[in-house]
Amino acid sequence: MNVIPNDSEAGAASENSGYLTSSRQVWFAFAMTFALMFFDFIDRQVIVSLFPHIKSEWHLSDKQLGSLVSVVSIVVGAGGLPVALVADRMGRVKSIVVMAVTWSLATISCMFTANYSQLFMARAVVGLGETGYGSVGVALISTLFPKSSRSAALGAFYAAPSLGSVLGVVLGGMIAARWGWKAAFGVVGVPGLVLALFYLLVRDYKTVALTPDSNPANQSLGLTLKRIFGALARTHTLLWVCAGASAQLITVSAMWSWLPSYLNRFHGMTPEAAGKAAAVVVLVGALSCTLWGFVVGRLTRRQPRNKLPALSALCLVTSVIFVAAFGGTYAAAIQFKLIVVGGFFMNCTVGVVAGVAMDVVHPGVRSTGAAVLSLFQNVFGLAVGPVLAGALSDRWGLQHALTVIPLCSVLAAIFFVIAMRSYDTDAARISDVQPDAAPALADTLSTGTAA
């Protein structure tokens, strides 16, 4: 298994402006990975606009409603590392196909639940299917694209969660108003099954050995784990970036989950109208996700470490705007405009932090490194925001909860500044390591050759 491409492969990569394989294959892989992430978050977030219906029918507390969102993130985070280890050893495309089928079937099963406990368990299985998808997808995209465009590509990829959340919130409200809230799960669960079949055509990359004599396909699991976690533990930048990303996502996930309910309770909107209004905020965040990935990457081309102070500044702006929006007294229209502006800034970290993480993680363990990031983001970020806001809401009211939560963005700003100190050292350690391309899984299956 080669660490450095041979002459023909290097020439092909050069002709394709640094892409690992042909640009057409790379963009097809990107499109398919983006599409699955899009439906991943439709399935994950469709429940948010259903909160008023579920609360009314089953008489749940805000904390219980928040837990229906948080349980997905907890399971995703807890299972991300094992799944990434399997993906780094056995292939990313195979792993992604299995994930997509699992979470799609689990989403469809939610429409048959009869009480809170059943829905909670079904949502946990949705998380089980989605476990590791983001990290494995990040590893695939990061390796296929050249480093110069990595942040922009990942910024675009990470627009998918926001766009999926937008459509999930809108569809949930619309379907619930016409056919009942349970039908929403059945409608959004089917497309993922179809996309899973097409994903078999995506071309993977060959797993790169951590050292020339450590082929991961042949060595023992114990030795593999020792080498992998030893490499990650030396990457201090990754750990601080994980902390910063998680803190910012507490703010993001709380806003995603509770804004429809806030508009319903405080501005008298119907659940359907509140879902559409909240979708505007999430959509602005989705567009800004791509924009920030491009802008930050462009401005820091010569000094990549400056991505981190840029993120720090953007997180501080996020906190100030949201605290002002929910902590002050305004006319409804003015408050909503402030919330939209906050939404423009709140997704600033999403694509950029993944790019920073991939800049400093060895290509042989990128799925696992991305899984560490995903673990922090899901367990300490996405899972915390909805349930923490729900608990604060039960105690002091939803408006006060949404005023306090954005202070987590200040913590994120501090962590990103600390991460800058070790970036150059960590990036230099892996600067000369490059992976090879692998054949598409569908081609492998058709010829009967092992990947």
Question: PLM features: what roles do these ranges have?
Answer:
Residues 14-22, 206-241, 266, 438-441:
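Juxtamembrane intracellular "pre-TM" segments in multi-pass secondary transporters
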Residues 47-48, 236-289, 350, 354, ...:
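Extracytoplasmic gate region of multi-pass secondary transporters
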Residues 59, 91, 112-118, 146, ...:
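Helix-breaking motifs and short loop linkers at transmembrane-helix boundaries and internal kinks
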Residues 78-114:
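Conserved MFS/SLC helix-loop-helix module at the cytosolic interface between two early adjacent transmembrane helices
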Residues 89-100, 298-314:
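Cytoplasmic membrane-interface "Motif A"-like loop-to-helix N-cap segments
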Residues 122-162:
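Cytoplasmic helix-loop-helix junction between adjacent transmembrane helices
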